[in-house]
Amino acid sequence: MRILSIIFLTLINSNISFSNDLEIEELLNKINLPDGFKISIYANNIENARSMSISPSGTVFVGNRKADNVFALKDIDGDGKVDKKYLITDKLKNMPNGVSYHKGDLYVAEVNKIWLFKDVEDNLKKYDEVGFYPEDPILISDEFPSDKHHGWKYISVGPDNRLYVPVGAPCNICESRDEIYSTITRMDLDGSNREIFARGVRNTVGFTWHPETGEMWFTDNGRDMLGDNYPPCELNRISKPNEHYGYPYCHGGNISDPEFGSKYPCDDFIKPVQNLGPHVAPLGVKFYNGNMFPEEYLSLIHI
């Protein structure tokens, strides 16, 4: 498996203050890109932009970890820059970070709740008429822990039409008091039938599915306080449900935790496909199968 690590800055959020477009261009010029690639600003002044999900029509939905806003962005004239920004909600007060568009609907994850915005793009058309988002979301789950440490969520609907929701460890390193922590869960789209899909996952904020095998691949952020050089963050693959990926007992496939590692050997757990380096905090992960990149980028996983 070849792995390509590329950083794409598609949003510049309001945590960074720019006095003019020249300052933005100077920032972009500091980013090293492969030959033939170009980077530009898609949208500016999107408060605390964090997670994104894109509809087939090109609408970009944006969640955040610090503000209370969820936005929809449209490039109406196709010039690669946002022409219209919609405030879908400013009433979700507990880190509405996770967003996942699926068949006309938008799922939004707070720390402890999952919301459904039905027919979201149809409602954006009504927004143009009335000047505000016309419908309140539907609460489909309030059964997740309220811990904010690793509590913000990346979510996505999988190829099995179920919603995948991680639950991070409520600490840097600990044995959790409830088995729901340090997992990836999945549920039906109405919030029912939640189950644990993967265990021993400290804090994943990026996962995707292989376009041919259908297997989930996910990044995991490694623990702190073992120095600058240990342990690595990870890229993992899920071949079957309910397997354990090591946390808090083993890190990087072969590093026994100094506090909890004596309880289980590293051989008891699924090893990473790739160690990514210590404290690199991998986030989004995608397999590329579009038609804009060179052929050698096809079917590679991008982190």
Regions found by a protein language model. Name each.
Residues 42-46, 87-92, 140-147, 196-200, ...:
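Surface loop/turn motifs at the tips and blade-to-blade linkers of beta-strand repeat domains
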Residues 69-72, 113-115, 183-185, 234:
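A short loop-to-beta-strand structural motif that recurs across blades of beta-propeller domains
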Residues 112-158:
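Asp-box/WD-like beta-propeller blade repeats and closely related beta-sheet repeat scaffolds
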Residues 55-57, 101-103, 157-160, 210-213, ...:
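Residue-level detector of Asp-centered blade-edge/turn motifs that repeat once per structural unit
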Residues 65, 111-113, 119, 168-170, ...:
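Short loop/turn segments immediately following the C-termini of beta-strands
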Residues 59-62, 105-108, 162-166, 215-219, ...:
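Conserved beta-propeller blade signature
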